[in-house]
Amino acid sequence: MPTLPPLPDWVALEHQVAHLMTKQELHGWYFNERAAWQLASALQKELEETKKVLRERHPFVEGATFNPKRNNKTQGYFQGCESVRLKELNPTSRDHIAWILSTFYGWKPTQLTTTGKPVIDETILMETASAGITIAGDFAKCLDITKKLGMISEGTNAWLKLCTTASRVHHHCSVGCATFRMSHKNPNLAQVPSDPRFRQLFVPTPGQVMVGADLAGIELRMLAHYLARYDDGRYADILLNGDIHQVNADKIGIS
């Protein structure tokens, strides 16, 4: 029987990572369900209050145009008299948001989707609010709270839906991306908001201590580690003491 060659270092390392991630998934995160329900309730209340303010200001948006072909006294239609059917404002509808901003505040979109619709996201709305259209900030707030409620209680993979009777959340994490970065699912705990109200939901198991680490820039730090044998630590020095992004920009002439 032929002897198989030894595994390359990177394969052995990936296997070790897979082993650690499996242990993490089986162990799970201890989750404060009571605090999570309280936070979800508070966010829901805040969302409804914000929606109420927006609907009081703009109750309706423009719907479909209707041109009756004949008179209808019961419905109040008259042949040839075009009318517009109104829809109740949905403060989390991007189409409704774009219509309100452009119709009443003269907003001009700077980005369009592939289908030609204005791009509406929290970043654009906050920039619009900073430019003087303050109501855009309320729309951004609605989108943000809706997203957070999806994480906690309402989404398919909401934390509270996946929390076990033992108050644990067992999320899956693996080197699953084509770029060899980590992928997270069921639920995605890599996107927990930095807001302390959310971070405090994940607590140490009683009798244990939770230890955390800041992994900002982890990919470049790992690259610097493996480059050190070839560049005597030059890349690591730039990364830690300089601005690696500016160095890269200078190299390709886009400074």
Question: Model-found features: residue ranges?
Answer:
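Conserved "right-hand" nucleotidyltransferase catalytic core of DNA-directed polymerases
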Residues: 1-197, 203-209, 216-219
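Poly-acidic low-complexity segments
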Residues: 32-33, 121, 231-234, 243-244
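Alpha-helical structural context
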Residues: 57, 104, 226, 251-252
